[in-house]
Regions:
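Surface-exposed, interaction-prone regions used to assemble/regulate multi-protein complexes
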Residues: 1-151
Length: 151
């Protein structure tokens, strides 16, 4: 499965997922990303809306992983998880690098909100290994258009 296919199998893709840890094993060509995936439904009742599930994203057959430096104007050094969203940024990558990838490779990028920068990944297979059941947070971060929010 490609990273985009995995993303499409999730209720919200990787939108508002939170990266907690990244590990790369170059000998085994495996990248693991511990994350909390937003699996909530914005149309759900408030107490069920902020639903997250923790898991480990496993990229096997890792071809490359590139982390862009953060924008200095963003809170990149604040401890804690980093919120992401997945996207296609192949237009920003070297075409000769993309052509050199083995057949069957995928390339996908994560935009890291706290950095205003990207994490680019190329690999052969992607899967998520769930570590927890769905948990519900009390913080309101996902609102419907026109919804009144008490501050």
């Amino acid at each position: 499965m490609t990273l985009e296919e995995l993303e499409n199998s999730l209720p919200n893709g990787f939108h508002d997922a939170e990266i907690q840890r990244i590990c790369i094993d170059y000998q085994q060509r495996i990248m693991t990303i511990d994350m909390a995936v937003f699996v909530g439904d914005v149309d759900a009742p408030l107490e069920k809306r902020e639903a997250y599930r923790e898991g480990t994203l496993v990229i096997s057959g890792l071809q490359f992983a590139t982390i862009e430096p953060p924008d200095a104007r963003y809170p990149f050094s604040t401890p804690g998880a980093s919120r992401i969203d997945a996207c296609d940024m192949t237009k920003n990558l070297d075409p000769s690098l993309l052509q050199a990838l083995p057949e069957g490779s995928f390339v996908r990028s994560f935009f890291v909100d706290d950095w205003n920068a990207f994490l680019h990944i190329a690999g052969l297979r992607a899967e998520i290994q769930w570590k927890t059941a769905v948990t519900y947070r009390n913080d309101r971060e996902h609102c419907l258009p026109g919804e009144t929010v008490d501050l």
